[in-house]
């Protein structure tokens, strides 16, 4: 069922698809799913959705005093799992599915702290730059600025580039985990039965300590088709072909809050 969801990209052979869930109002709700590369100890992408069940802000971020802060992912059953390296080679533990993306329940937020959801990110990139794009997506998908007015469902895929050597900056976690050279997002909006999409491609570097404006973030916009060309990942492939081909050509930042 996870592989047939709209947010789930096409997978690469040899990798492991993991999904985390919580019980919300008596129903099982997916926090996110991911494609984990067991050789590189890093996820190729994480995917999730904002909808009526998942857009609420009900709980705070997991308490940093709760140890381990970044536990091994129990869904890997210890196979090719990577334990946290506290030093992380000076990089931040960058959430792929952000903690602030999943605040609708305690379990859902805790699920975002597994090591499979972590990527080594430069501090200023994580805390000052990427976070602005994350905030925009949260505004579009959650119960805040736009509420449910922007999308009935907003599908999100995030990741860092780990497949090709020329898209890897280096290695962290005792040289076992690649540091992506680029990070990306692919978004699919469904509103009143109509589909639209946009994507973002961002070089992983230190952009300084001043948070960028949305006009600056807009410079990172690309179409989903362009992002597929950059990453080799087939996004939103579970859409009907005629819909997929149309929406994946789109890149209109003005209709996405920019």
Residue ranges of each PLM-predicted region?
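Domain-level detector for secreted/extracellular nuclease and nuclease-toxin modules, and
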Residues: 1-258
């Amino acid at each position: 069922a996870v592989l047939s969801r709209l947010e789930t990209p096409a997978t690469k052979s040899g990798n492991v698809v993991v999904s985390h869930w919580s019980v919300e109002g008596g129903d099982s709700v997916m926090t996110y799913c991911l494609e984990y590369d067991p050789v590189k100890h890093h996820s190729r992408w994480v995917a999730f959705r904002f909808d009526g069940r998942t857009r609420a802000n009900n709980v705070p971020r997991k308490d940093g005093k709760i140890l381990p802060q970044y536990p091994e992912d129990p869904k890997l059953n210890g196979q090719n799992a990577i334990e946290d390296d506290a030093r992380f080679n000076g990089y931040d533990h960058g959430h792929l599915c952000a903690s602030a993306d999943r605040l609708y329940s305690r379990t859902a937020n805790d699920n975002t702290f597994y090591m499979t959801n972590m990527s080594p990110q430069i501090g200023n990139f994580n805390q000052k730059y990427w976070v602005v794009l994350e905030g925009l997506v949260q505004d579009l998908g959650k119960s805040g600025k736009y509420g449910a007015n922007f999308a009935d469902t907003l599908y999100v895929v995030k990741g860092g580039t780990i497949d090709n050597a020329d898209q890897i900056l280096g290695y962290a976690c005792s040289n076992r985990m690649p540091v992506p050279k680029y990070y990306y997002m692919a978004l699919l909006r469904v509103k009143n039965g109509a589909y639209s999409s946009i994507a973002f491609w961002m070089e992983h570097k230190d952009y300084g300590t001043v948070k960028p404006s949305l006009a600056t973030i807009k410079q990172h916009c690309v179409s989903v088709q362009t992002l597929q060309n950059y990453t080799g990942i087939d996004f939103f492939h579970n859409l009907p072909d005629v819909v997929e081909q149309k929406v994946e050509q789109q890149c209109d930042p003005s209709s996405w809050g920019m």
